UniProtKB/Swiss-Prot annotation:
One of its GO terms (molecular function) is ATP-dependent peptidase activity. This is Putative 26S proteasome regulatory subunit homolog MTH_1011. GO terms for biological process: proteolysis. One of its GO terms (cellular component) is proteasome complex. PROSITE patterns: AAA. It comes from Methanothermobacter thermautotrophicus (strain ATCC 29096 / DSM 1053 / JCM 10044 / NBRC 100330 / Delta H). InterPro entries: AAA+_ATPase (IPR003593), ATPase_AAA_core (IPR003959), ATPase_AAA_CS (IPR003960), CbxX/CfxQ (IPR000641), P-loop_NTPase (IPR027417). SUPFAM superfamilies: P-loop containing nucleoside triphosphate hydrolases. The 26S proteasome is involved in the ATP-dependent degradation of ubiquitinated proteins. The regulatory (or ATPase) complex confers ATP dependency and substrate specificity to the 26S complex. Belongs to the AAA ATPase family. PANTHER family: ATP-DEPENDENT ZINC METALLOPROTEASE YME1L1 (PTHR23076:SF97), METALLOPROTEASE M41 FTSH (PTHR23076). Keywords: ATP-binding, Nucleotide-binding, Proteasome.
Length: 372
């Protein structure tokens, strides 16, 4: 039974509308994900059934048999014609969208009480990521692999570790990588892989990789890797965490040949990762704090979009924001200063507002939690 309960809401991409390309009605659907919805209407003489696919293979055969030739468009509905006439299933995911269901289409049924796991879509490009030139160069190797997985085979960069200070662009670069190649990106937090019951976490990992394989080439981005992969010297490993780690190692080892799937793990503290997990990453990519020139580019880009004019020299801001990440500059300096100016009904962000933001940041200090 398939469970996808790791949806990541990303306001940067979730609230945007993405144009759907004109579909080819003869193009074969590789994957269709369905969610049980129910009947168009019910009366007090009948009770809406709970739909659970006890046997996934049998459900796929059953579904393909009655819906072969139907067009699978995301957001549309398919109605059962056999066991439960007129019972509706919503098409949550179709890959590619608007394609035709055939005998070769993989069909997955979500549980009634679970939210679907879905890909994150983004319009971010590598040019939007300021700095991190070394990381970008290494990411182009991943791009070459995803463009032609069959060419690389055993030489593929399948498991890559992004590490560095918070807010340095690890997630942003992964989004740009997937967007430029137009491949699915599955973005999850490691802590969400720990299930409520024994076996839940391992099952979710295997099902995640199954989904990624069926939509390959694709990218799986696991954030906060140290939350589950912490070195055993620093924790008493719980059974539910251990099963998640073992399932993840199985997938990363390639026991199930997930050709065309790249796993990117992200952590702020690579030295705290368990050796068994860290050794599975063939490539480690460091994300560094921006230098003076990079901070200047960031500041100019951010200030250009602010709702109030900034009456403060950019060059001076560059010096005042040394050792800060791009996220710190935007959220903890510029945003705090902007909100202070708005609260005072000021027509611009002035020196005193910048000074207030810098003072607030100094008072609050850096987060001490190792997973921050």
């Amino acid at each position: 039974m398939v469970k996808f309960n790791n949806i990541i809401y990303d306001p940067q991409v979730s609230d945007k509308k993405f144009p759907v390309q004109a579909s080819d009605p003869e193009r074969e659907a590789k994957l269709v994900v369905l969610q049980p919805v129910g009947y168009p209407f019910v009366c007090n003489l009948m009770e809406a059934p709970r739909i659970d696919a006890v046997n996934k293979e049998l459900f796929e055969i059953y579904a393909r048999d009655q819906w072969e030739g139907f067009r699978a468009a995301e957001g549309s509905y398919l109605f059962d014609q056999k066991l439960l006439p007129d019972y509706a299933f919503k098409i949550i995911r179709a890959h590619p969208d608007g394609s035709k269901i055939t005998r070769n289409t993989s069909i997955i049924l979500l549980e009634n009480d679970r939210e679907e796991f879905h890909e994150v879509r983004s319009s971010i490009t590598m040019d939007d990521v300021i700095g991190q030139e070394d990381a970008k160069i290494k990411c182009r190797i991943i791009m070459k692999y995803l463009e032609d997985p069959d060419r690389f085979r055993d030489w593929a960069p399948r498991n890559v570790l992004f590490h560095g200070s918070p807010g340095t662009g690890k997630t942003m670069l992964a989004k740009s990588l997937a967007n430029e190649l137009k491949v699915p990106l599955y973005l999850i937090k490691a802590t969400s892989l720990i299930g409520e019951h024994v076996g839940d976490g391992a099952r979710q990992i295997h099902e995640l990789y199954e989904l990624a394989s069926k939509t390959a080439p694709s990218v799986i981005f696991i954030d906060e890797m140290d939350a589950i992969g912490l070195d055993r010297r620093y924790q008493s490993l719980r059974g539910d965490v251990s099963e998640v780690v073992n399932a993840l190692l199985t997938e990363m080892d390639g026991i199930n040949q997930n050709w065309g799937v790249v796993t990117i793990g992200a952590t702020n503290n690579p030295e705290l990762l368990d050796k068994a997990i860290r050794s599975r990453f063939e490539e480690e990519i460091e994300f560094k704090l921006p230098d003076d020139e990079e901070r200047k580019l960031m500041l100019e880009k951010y200030i250009e979009t602010m709702p109030l004019k900034v009456d403060f020299p950019v060059d001076k801001l560059v010096k005042l924001t040394r050792e800060m990440s791009g996220r710190d500059i935007k959220d903890r300096v510029l945003k705090t200063a902007l909100h202070r100016a708005i609260a005072e009904d000021s027509e611009s962000v002035r020196a005193e507002h910048i000074e207030y933001a810098l003072k607030e940041r100094k008072v609050s200090g850096e987060p001490k939690h190792m997973f921050a």
